[in-house]
Amino acid sequence: MKFKLKNRIIGAAILVGIITSMPFYLTAEDEEEKPIRRERLMQRFDKNKDGKLDESEREAIRKSFSRSRRSGEDNSAKRVDKIHVPDDYDPKKKYPFILTLHGYTGNGRAQLRFLPLDRLAEKYDFIYCAPDGIDRSWNATDACCDRQGKVDDSKYLRSLILKAMKEYNIDRKRVYITGLSNGGFMSYRMAHDHSDLVTAIVPFAGVGFDKWPSNPKNPVSVLHIHGTKDRTIKWGGGGLRSARYPSAEDN
């Protein structure tokens, strides 16, 4: 799949200003949260308290996650997806909208630690949303990362964008999606599925399908950011869940 580059959009201050104004360490996973997640899992599922998870305990974890997976509609009440506006919001003024998507096992709060739109929104005057994926994942591609494949996140995120447009004065020519790892995969999925809404995407360490079923109906700008030494979503491409994902360059 090829996305046409429109320099006037990629060069927009809303994107360049946000990316260049903040220091951050790019990684495909939130390393800071890994020990915390493991400790919580051990406390809950390590029944014999031997510090290890045997197969029965691992199966209990898998069942725990799968119980809450039904459909995007059934689980919508579990999502946190508040739309945030600047303190001095003026309904007569058009605002850019940024949708930022967390990585696998993350959530909206963790994504805002990675990309602090909550602090930047006042400075750059935009509206944003950092929603939660069901069970901390997005059903983006066959490789990453909803293991059940039953949540229609593409439909859900489209409805979220339309909700923002209905409730606030959103500039339809400045609708941006950014995401980390699994969220980056989802940003590519949204650019493909909803090119009528999405102006540009900025994926961090996330790609799309190895083979796209079609091109998007409208051109979407892409600013792809990826570490060449990323060991999770590899620069040169690889496989997850017996499915392939493309290299950053081929993507």
Model regions: which residues?
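Bacterial N-terminal signal peptides
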Residues: A12-S21
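EF-hand Ca2+-binding helix-loop-helix modules
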Residues: D30-R44, R58-A60
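Acidic carboxylate motifs that coordinate Ca2+ or other divalent cations, activating on Asp/Glu
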Residues: D46-D50, D230
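Glycine-aliphatic tripeptides that mark coil-to-beta-strand junctions in extracellular
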Residues: G51-E55, Y95, I233
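Amphipathic regulatory helices of Ca2+-sensor modules
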Residues: E55-F65
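Serine-hydrolase catalytic machinery in alpha/beta-hydrolase-like enzymes
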Residues: D74-Y176, M186-R189, D193, G236, ...
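Primarily recognizes the serine-hydrolase "nucleophile elbow" in alpha/beta-hydrolase
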Residues: M165-E167, R172-V220, R231
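Short beta-strand/loop motif that positions the catalytic acidic residue
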Residues: H224-H226, D230
